[in-house]
């Protein structure tokens, strides 16, 4: 029989409607019959008791806010009746928990590209990256011309990645731009890269070249458009040379321990923390047990669930780094006069998410139960395997770009409302509900909605692992098929 509601944690005093519920309908929870006093949309919460004003609403076993007014049992409770408990900066105490994933190691491989420096990519693409937005038009024309000329034969894609920055920036913004562009250029999914500059920008070509550090000079080339006659002719000449080298690369068997994935959610709904996000958590734990790596970001969407992550930090030093990660972002909000709890979007609320704690406790399901083994600043590159936390905002474009930039081969993106967006690595969309998967097959790659339709999570995860391996081995996801590929760089300061 189809389940019509779900109590996520035994301590919860609300349940989530799995399908639309009608006024007068009776549900039985923990042996108690409750008659609904109003219609409740799927994904939204039903009260299991009478709430006094100020009493905490418990979901996922934790408070997600408090009742603004008294609320009766059997009512639909949403953002109009729940207020966040979040405030400003907090002092945290390290209360470490013991983690034992108890997941057997399997001899799994995927077909990847082994680079000269020993790193592995899951795509072999030719990228054109501008140091400044002034040359965006040029790089677009170059990419289109090379695609027409070669039909991408022998490579996975030929892509230009325009952005608006590289000039009129100071301080952290200028450094952030340089870091993200550097990280892209060094990313193993690129078989060859042409860096196109104007010549007079803040992000000076010679300085940026030094900023890159060690790179493969056979596969990374520069063109300064102010220093050449016909930039299109010169650009095509360089690109033909790069393309000829990239297309000689071949896939080989690579252990799954080399795979690095980013964990992302966007357009979340009331099913996110029940289906797709726990699925990612189960996969993340599996991957880490195989020696692989997963990365969680969207720091503002950790607010309200941060202590869960802090207590999973393997060391006191990592705990302290996580405290800084959280409080630095809170200070960023407060310095702009913004409350730290004003996060859920209109789409989130329509889908059943009422407060930031509600969103955060669902969001952090994506990283499973593993120890936290690394904490990174924005623009940093991965140094350790296992579960890493990355500083970046919740914005889909900025966060996904940051995940790819730190070295993730692909971004696993759960969504309940749907989005076509993809960043510069494969951006796999996992739907939280089957309706979205059916309505948006051009966007959605994998449907986790079956988890509330009587398919066991373990079986869904087995299928998901198989699909991940196919994608890592070259099967394109929808954002690649449709060429929905963009980058966005975090900006916090002034524009000159």
Predicted features by range, described:
Residues 1-410, 417-420, 425-496:
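Metallocofactor- and cofactor-centric catalytic cores in central/energy metabolism, strongly enriched
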């Amino acid at each position: 029989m189809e389940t019509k509601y779900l109590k996520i944690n035994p301590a919860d005093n609300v349940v989530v409607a799995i399908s639309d519920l009608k006024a007068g309908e009776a549900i039985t929870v923990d042996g108690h019959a409750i008659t609904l006093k109003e219609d409740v949309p799927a994904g939204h919460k039903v009260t299991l008791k009478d709430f006094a004003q100020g009493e905490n609403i418990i979901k996922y076993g934790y408070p997600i806010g408090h009742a603004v007014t008294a609320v009766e049992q059997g009512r639909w409770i949403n953002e109009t009746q729940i207020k966040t408990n979040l405030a400003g900066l907090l002092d945290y105490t390290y209360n470490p928990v013991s983690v034992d994933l108890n997941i057997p190691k399997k001899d799994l491989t995927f077909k990847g590209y082994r680079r000269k420096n020993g790193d592995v990519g899951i795509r072999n693409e030719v990228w054109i990256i501008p140091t400044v937005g002034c040359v965006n038009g040029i790089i677009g024309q170059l990419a289109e011309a090379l695609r027409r000329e070669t039909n991408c034969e022998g490579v996975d894609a030929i892509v230009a990645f325009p952005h608006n920055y590289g000039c009129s920036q100071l301080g952290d913004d200028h450094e952030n731009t340089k870091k993200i562009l550097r990280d892209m250029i060094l990313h193993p999914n690129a078989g060859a890269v042409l860096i196109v500059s104007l010549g007079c920008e803040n992000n000076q070509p010679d300085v940026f070249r030094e900023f890159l550090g060690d790179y493969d000079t056979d596969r990374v080339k520069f063109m300064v458009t102010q220093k050449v006659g016909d930039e299109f002719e010169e650009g095509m000449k360089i690109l033909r040379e790069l393309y000829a080298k990239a297309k000689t690369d071949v896939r080989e068997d690579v252990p799954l321990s080399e795979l690095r994935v980013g964990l992302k959610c966007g357009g979340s709904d009331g099913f996110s923390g029940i289906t797709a996000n726990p699925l990612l958590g189960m996969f993340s734990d599996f991957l880490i047990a195989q020696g692989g790596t997963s990365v969680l970001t969207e720091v503002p969407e950790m607010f309200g669930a941060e202590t869960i992550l802090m207590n999973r930090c393997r060391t006191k030093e990592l705990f302290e780094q996580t405290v800084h990660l959280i409080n630095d972002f809170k200070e960023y909000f407060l310095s702009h006069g913004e409350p730290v709890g004003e996060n859920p979007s209109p789409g989130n609320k329509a889908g059943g998410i009422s407060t930031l704690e509600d969103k955060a406790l669902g969001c952090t399901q994506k990283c499973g139960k593993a120890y936290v083994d690394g904490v990174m600043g924005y623009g940093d590159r991965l140094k350790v395997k296992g579960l890493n936390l990355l500083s970046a905002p919740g914005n889909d474009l900025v966060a996904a770009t940051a995940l790819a930039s730190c070295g993730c081969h692909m971004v696993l993106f759960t969504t309940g409302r749907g989005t076509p967006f993809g960043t510069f690595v494969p951006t796999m969309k996992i739907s939280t509900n089957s309706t979205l998967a059916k309505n948006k097959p051009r966007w959605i790659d994998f449907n986790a909605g079956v988890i509330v339709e009587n398919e066991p999570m373990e079986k869904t995860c087995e299928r998901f692992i198989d699909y991940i391996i196919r994608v890592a081995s070259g099967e394109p996801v929808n954002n690649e098929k449709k060429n929905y590929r963009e980058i966005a760089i975090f900006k916090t300061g002034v524009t000159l």
